[in-house]
Regions:
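Membrane-helix boundary/helix-loop-helix interface segments in multi-pass membrane proteins
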Residues: 1-5, 11-153, 221
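Signal for well-folded cores of large energy- and translation-related assemblies
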Residues: 12, 78, 171, 209-212
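A short hydrophobic/aromatic micro-motif that marks alpha-helical segments and, especially, helix-coil
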Residues: 24, 68, 114, 120, ...
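Hydrophobic alpha-helical segments of polytopic membrane proteins
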Residues: 62-63, 67-69, 132-195, 207
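Hydrophobic, glycine- and aromatic-enriched re-entrant/interface helices and adjoining loop segments
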Residues: 81-90, 94-97, 178-227
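Short, surface-exposed helix-loop/turn micro-motifs enriched in polar/charged residues
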Residues: 83, 127, 158-159, 196
Length: 227
């Protein structure tokens, strides 16, 4: 399925970029070739990562969490992070720029998965205090990561991280009442963050009704619907 999606993506890149590539570079397949090279690098990296046993990922969860926090702190340091459109999300490494929030999300979710596996019994016990304390620890970690992401700011990564983590917590078999309270609190917090920011409010309303400003805030969504 992943390879099929990759092939479909390359096909769409070729279809959408040929006129622009021909006009700008004289090579109609310029962007396709470049994207294909990136895809090949990604496949080679995926093949290498697949060889690492799951037990190593589990043992390395705490280290990866510290790496995630470190990256999100470093990118905010003056002279280290690169500001793009008002957000400090990138670190330059030679000829490439790395969006540290993507690595941080991956590392954090590996840690959460490791934690849920190690403390699954505590999360599922009937004793409220024991299960609540077991659930509180990863939630504190997620809160710290969310604050660092919001300082960039990168609200979209916060939403993806929290939604994925909540899904993992639910699948781990946590008490339904505790999960409902956690879900309600998280949703309320997200709503406050959206409504308190004009930019986030505009993005939400543009998503709900992109045709209202088809050549402004809703341009990308409208073009994707047309395509």
């Amino acid at each position: 399925a992943a390879l099929l999606l990759l092939a479909l993506g390359l096909l769409m890149v070729a279809s959408a970029s040929m006129p622009i590539a021909a006009r700008q570079t004289g090579q109609p397949f310029y962007f396709l070739i470049r994207q294909g090279a990136f895809a090949l690098i990604g496949l080679l990296a995926a093949g290498f990562i697949f060889q690492i046993p799951l037990t190593r990922w589990q043992r390395g969860g705490p280290v990866l969490l510290l790496a995630a926090i470190g990256l999100l702190v470093i990118v905010l340091a003056p002279g280290v992070g690169k500001e793009v459109n008002g957000s400090m999300r990138w670190i330059g490494v030679g000829p490439i720029n790395i969006q540290v929030s993507e690595l941080a999300k991956l590392f954090t979710l590996i840690y959460i998965a490791s934690y849920l596996q190690r403390h699954g019994e505590e999360l599922r016990v009937a004793n409220f205090r024991t299960s609540a304390l077991a659930l509180l620890r990863p939630m504190v970690v997620l809160a710290v990561l969310a604050v660092l992401l919001l300082l960039e700011p990168d609200f979209g990564s916060v939403v993806v991280l929290m939604a994925t983590a909540l899904g993992m917590v639910f699948l781990a078999g946590v008490n339904l009442w505790q999960f409902s309270a956690l879900l309600t609190g998280t949703t309320a917090t997200m709503a406050v963050l959206i409504l308190s920011s004009p930019y986030r409010r505009e993005r939400l309303f543009s998503f709900l009704d992109p045709w209202k400003d088809a050549f402004g805030s809703g341009f990308q969504l409208v073009q994707s619907l047309i395509a």
